[in-house]
Amino acid sequence: MSRFFTTGSDSESESSLSGEELVTKPVGGNYGKQPLLLSEDEEDTKRVVRSAKDKRFEELTNLIRTIRNAMKIRDVTKCLEEFELLGKAYGKAKSIVDKEGVPRFYIRILADLEDYLNELWEDKEGKKKMNKNNAKALSTLRQKIRKYNRDFESHITNYKQNPEQSADEDAEKNEEDSEGSSDEDEDDDGVTAAAFLKKKSEAPSGDSRKFLKKEDEDEDSEESEDSEAWDTSSTSSDSDSEEEEGKQTVLASRFLKKAPTTEEDKKAAEKKREDKAKKKHDRKSRRPDEEEEDNEGGEWERVRGGVPLVKEKPKMFAKGTEITHAVVIKKLNEILQARGKKGTDRAAQIELLQLLVQIASENNLGEGVIVKIKFNIIASLYDYNPNLATYMKPEMWQKCLDCINELMDILFANPNIFVGENILEESENLHNADQPLRVRGCILTLVERMDEEFTKIMQNTDPHSQEYVEHLKDEAQVCAIIERVQRYLEEKGTTEEVCRIYLRRILHTYYKFDYKAHQRQLTPPEGSSKSEQDQAENEGEDSAVLMERLCKYIYAKDRTDRIRTCAILCHIYHHALHSRWYQARDLMLMSHLQDNIQHADPPVQILYNRTMVQLGICAFRQGLTKDAHNALLDIQSSGRAKELLGQGLLLRSLQERNQEQEKVERRRQVPFHLHINLELLECVYLVSAMLLEIPYMAAHESDARRRMISKQFHHQLRVGERQPLLGPPESMREHVVAASKAMKMGDWKTCHSFIINEKMNGKVWDLFPEADKVRTMLVRKIQEESLRTYLFTYSSVYDSISMETLSDMFELDLPTVHSIISKMIINEELMASLDQPTQTVVMHRTEPTAQQNLALQLAEKLGSLVENNERVFDHKQGTYGGYFRDQKDGYRKNEGYMRRGGYRQQQSQTAY
């Protein structure tokens, strides 16, 4: 029979086990007769009685505690989750809050959380270091807390005016409540449930109640004043229980707080309360003094908890070990064996390798060992990010540059060291100074990987931030390292390696405009001083000479098509960038790249598209609008210029590829500082199309089958015509459309004002290196094409027109007008003749007028209508109908309507 079904306490059951009969619990009996016949575990769970207010407020305080912990560790995602739960818990407690008022601790957490989020939001550096989830949660939570706090605006304002007072009021209120409850217990000499309730952590369970120590009571004396009212004498309780043996008493009465009955007990309790109040007052008075001392003591220093300030260096070798080449190489191989394995600390591995270099240099083990370890350090830095799309951190990137520079210093200082990827590890010579030192490794591969890492850094940095500018400054170091490796490989490398490093040098040179060389071309040598000439000589060769030298070497020595193709495209791009149109065009035509570029890999195709665009812009600067239009036609007509130039992905095409393909294509994008301005590109294309299309439309206005030179230009014209209300142009496209309409009328001044104005200068024309020359060229082209359009449009109106009049109208000199009209007459575009003595253009009027053109069109349409009707009638009558019998099959002999075929046949017979 279980002991837990006995009546009385544990002590009773223990003492009377042998001598007395156990009282059994009747099956199916009335439980109301023995309401507290419970086991110890049931006692612990059922004796805690809490009000609804306590339950709701405890739930709120637990959530607030979790939020504050998350705030300490800057876990904004956790803060967001707990804040949403806090709002729901507050909604459940709404009925209690309406009666009691909004608790102060709730207002405090709302105010503190809002201040905390504002502080995080203003910390720009901290936001950059946040992960994606925390950054997203910060934005969401900041909006939610601002919206939520509007309902508590007055409470938060009162709290912020005196936050300390609010905190003290809460503490005092809690103390008064606890003291008031204890006083009531003393006066009433009664027992309430709240008088003996304790937290689970404070309530001992099982037999441990008998063995509570005095130290436990001393530790909890400051937390609650209820401890003094508990009966500390276990012997008295035991004796009481012995006296009550055999009675069915309530077990909870053993744990009820007893009211002090004697005067001594009352005095002791009163003294304890006074001591506690005094301690509290001392703490309050001591707090401002401590704050002043802290402020005077200097600035605070933020430290990471749990991390020792002085980090001990890892021990590489046991104490007393002799450091030799074999020991260091063995240790190096041990470190490298963990490379790439799961769970390997890559940062610690890099640190160990750096420490190994330091040990090797301190023990004078030779440069060969140091070079080998340096190669592995750089390789470990590249392997730090296993994900291909992840770019290097700034500190790792700087460490990589420094390490490569140190490696190059060693190689240049020790010509007897030979490095190469074809050297086997068994044939390495790291310490024998009598023979040349041989180390396995490829410096060219390291530099190519460094260049790729630099590209990834630029791709993943916000191009409109100062951080991008700071990273772009590192290109000078990258170019310097490439130049040093170039000099090293020119002495000791193979032809293939030299071609590869030359291509790297070309890729960092081809897109840069050489302003110094351009300035020297504008300034004649006689006009420059001697110091300027000396400075120009010291600066080295121009970029044009450098590109010529590097590319010619690749043309002659390279055996791979890819390197030669890239070199040709970069060379053409550089020529076009510096307005050497004919050299760039001839090189493109001689290379025949346009015939087989579709078989090249995507990065080379992107480079080809960039080169063609730059070639078209160069032709436009030279005034060759037709060549410019032809070069830009393929890129602009596709509507995917941004994607074809590697400057971004289109949203509509994102749905056509999966996530992996998107990542691959994003890695192909060129960095922002290599981008070509797409608005400038479109403007150049549309202006070129306007200068070609408007005169052509005027010359073939009556031709129903005229072809379109540029579909995109016609599309922009149709969009402009569909506008119900035309206002002044705002965008670049609207300016070009408005200029086209003016050119149709031969109004070159209005056309000029739409193409060249302050807004267009800022958007397009000022971006050219020689902006004034481009604007002058544009004005001249607009005047010439407007003259051609005017003659095509109004030739039917004039019998003759003076060239001087045309010269005055379009502000062109007379020889230019004469040249334009002569070309039009020679090409049979204008049916006229020049009268040299009078300097007039005599129109021949062979072309039909507009009214005659309309009449001819009407006649053709009527003729086709009659023929269609006759065919329909023949089909209805059948082959043996009366029509064919009466006409004697004349229609089938081409003697139908107007007998045109017969007349022409007869005319041709008489010609013979």
Curated annotation (Swiss-Prot):
Domain PCI: 672-848
A cellular component term, taken from the record's GO annotations: eukaryotic translation initiation factor 3 complex, eIF3m
Bias type Polar residues, positions: 521-530
Residue numbers of Phosphoserine PTMs: 9, 11, 13, 15-16, 18, 39, 166, 178, 181-182, 908
Modification N6-acetyllysine, positions: 99, 642
Start-end of Basic and acidic residues biased regions: 199-215, 260-277, 885-898
Renumbered residue ranges of the record's region Disordered: 1-44, 157-305, 521-541, 884-912
Annotated positions of the Phosphothreonine modification: 523
Post-translational modification (record): Phosphorylated. Phosphorylation is enhanced upon serum stimulation.
Name of this chain's protein: Eukaryotic translation initiation factor 3 subunit C
Organism: Bos taurus (Bovine)
